[in-house]
Curated annotation (Swiss-Prot):
Its main location: nucleus. GO terms for molecular function: DNA-binding transcription factor activity, RNA polymerase II-specific; RNA polymerase II cis-regulatory region sequence-specific DNA binding. This is Homeobox protein SMOX-1. Residues 61-88 are annotated as: Disordered. It comes from Schistosoma mansoni (Blood fluke). A motif (Antp-type hexapeptide) lies at residues 214-219. It is found in: Nucleus. Residues 229-280 bind DNA. SUPFAM superfamilies: Homeodomain-like (SSF46689).
Length: 280
């Protein structure tokens, strides 16, 4: 302990932790995990199962980038180059596929026919230079296994059938115009028929009104009085109004005997006296 006093702080820390250096792994060493557990230090555990294949993703030896391999020769060259790299397991997923039950076994197969169809997509999707087909199943119908659907679909695309398409559209337009004309004619006929029916009904109504006998009991009560004979609003003279106001000042409610006396004095009917007091 006395010797450690003369040492610097860094030397003392180095002596204290000199025996524990082997307890912790270095940064370039990864722990091994049993089957079925994810390795958090390996990025391939979080990759989608569809891209975890030996023949799909490898590390380029020069620029540390990933590329696609389609042949077995490229896989062999890649394994030899990765042997020189101490951290090849961070880029190559060949060791992970041995434990991963979801590894992809099928390799990518590039079909020349599919590539040619993709290159000529714009030309094949044009119908006679004017009409463009936007259906996503267009190429699937052309390259499908069913012969009936492909032949029918190809026949519609060929330029020799343009006359058929034009004739069909013309027929549709002509039929629609004929339908419009027929509907107009039908509407005019209906209008004329309605006018004729209305005139005949009016004529029959006039004739029936002149021939029908109306008895007194058929009319409602009071309809026998003409417009001139209807009761008009009663206008009271100043003298009548004055006498009625004096009577109302003394008696707000009249008896029938007093009402008859006032009506005889003011030359009014008993009903008129009653209505005036009710309104007052």
């Amino acid at each position: 302990n006395s010797n450690n006093i003369n040492l610097s702080y860094d030397d003392q820390q180095r002596l204290i932790y000199s025996g524990t250096e082997q307890k912790y792994p270095t940064s370039n060493q990864l722990k091994s995990y049993p089957n079925g557990l994810l390795n958090p230090f390996n990025g391939t555990n979080f990759m989608h199962p569809t891209i975890q294949s030996n023949s799909l993703i490898t590390r380029h030896p020069n620029n540390n980038s990933f590329q696609l391999n389609t042949t077995n020769d490229s896989n062999n060259n890649n394994t030899t180059n990765n042997g020189n790299d101490s951290r090849s397991h961070l880029y190559d997923i060949s060791t992970f596929n041995a434990q991963n039950p979801y590894s992809l076994t099928n390799t990518l197969n590039f079909n020349s026919r599919t590539m040619n169809n993709q290159l000529t997509m714009n030309d094949s999707m044009k119908l006679n230079g004017n009409l463009t087909l936007h259906d996503t199943n267009y190429h699937a119908l052309l390259n499908g296994s069913t012969s009936f659907g492909s032949t029918v679909f190809r026949s519609l695309v060929n330029s020799e059938n343009q006359s058929y398409l034009n004739s069909s559209t013309n027929m549709l337009m002509n039929s629609s115009l004929d339908n419009i004309n027929n509907s107009n004619d039908h509407s005019t006929l209906n209008d004329n028929n309605n006018d004729c029916i209305g005139q005949s009904l009016r004529q029959s109504g006039n004739s029936s009104e002149s021939n029908v006998v109306v008895y007194p009991w058929m009319n409602p009560k009071g309809t026998d009085i003409s417009v001139d004979q209807k009761r008009t609003r009663q206008t009271y003279t100043r003298y009548q109004t004055l006498e009625l106001e004096k009577e109302f000042h003394f008696n707000k409610y009249l008896t029938r005997r007093r009402r008859i006396e006032i009506a005889h004095t003011l030359t009014l009917t008993e009903r008129q006296i009653k209505i005036w007091f009710q309104n007052r």
